[in-house]
Amino acid sequence: MTMDDGRASTSTPVTRTARQALIVQILNRQRVTSQVQLSELLLDEGIDITQATLSRDLDELGARKVRPDRGRAFYAIGPVDTTIGEDLRGPQEKLRRMLDELLVSTDHSGNIAMLRTPPGAAQYLASFIDRVGLKEVVGTIAGDDTVFVLAREPLTGRDLGELLGGRAGARGPEGKV
């Protein structure tokens, strides 16, 4: 559906996760130099967002302004091309903090690491793990308080659980990390 001015409109409320996923898509496909520009691009997609919410989303996503040697600064999420001369560690640091706050315990089976969180936190954590793009992770599946994280070969679920749990100091099923 489109509005009278040609912009897309959304008939259902957009969740924070969906909105943040769209922000990541936009930042990955083009250089966005300001929050005003990003809010206009989101509006083109049918998402009307306040500056405060957009700023909070960018912070939660670990977005940083990157200034290439020649050119205007732009928002980026994740590692930045080495020609820009800057490595963004923000998202991985944010993941460590999130794991510190949300990870209750870890377990594993085969190539799956199972992360336990407080009720209601699993989808938020899984979404962030996916956005960070750890090379050790193929993907995640989340319930209410449990996240299954699929380890990329040759890692095992135990290795991945120890890696993620070690970042947070979480305990395994028998009190071990």
UniProtKB/Swiss-Prot annotation:
GO terms for molecular function: arginine binding; DNA binding; DNA-binding transcription factor activity. Pathway: Amino-acid biosynthesis; L-arginine biosynthesis [regulation]. It is found in: Cytoplasm. It comes from the Bacteria. Keywords: Amino-acid biosynthesis, Arginine biosynthesis, Cytoplasm, DNA-binding, Repressor, Transcription, Transcription regulation. Transmembrane segments: none annotated. SUPFAM superfamilies: C-terminal domain of arginine repressor, Winged helix' DNA-binding domain. It holds the Pfam family Arg_repressor. GO terms for biological process: L-arginine biosynthetic process; protein complex oligomerization; regulation of arginine biosynthetic process. Its main location: cytoplasm. GO terms for cellular component: cytoplasm. NCBIfam families: argR_whole (TIGR01529), PRK03341.1 (NF002880). Regulates arginine biosynthesis genes. Belongs to the ArgR family. This is Arginine repressor. It comes from Corynebacterium efficiens (strain DSM 44549 / YS-314 / AJ 12310 / JCM 11189 / NBRC 100395). The gene is argR.
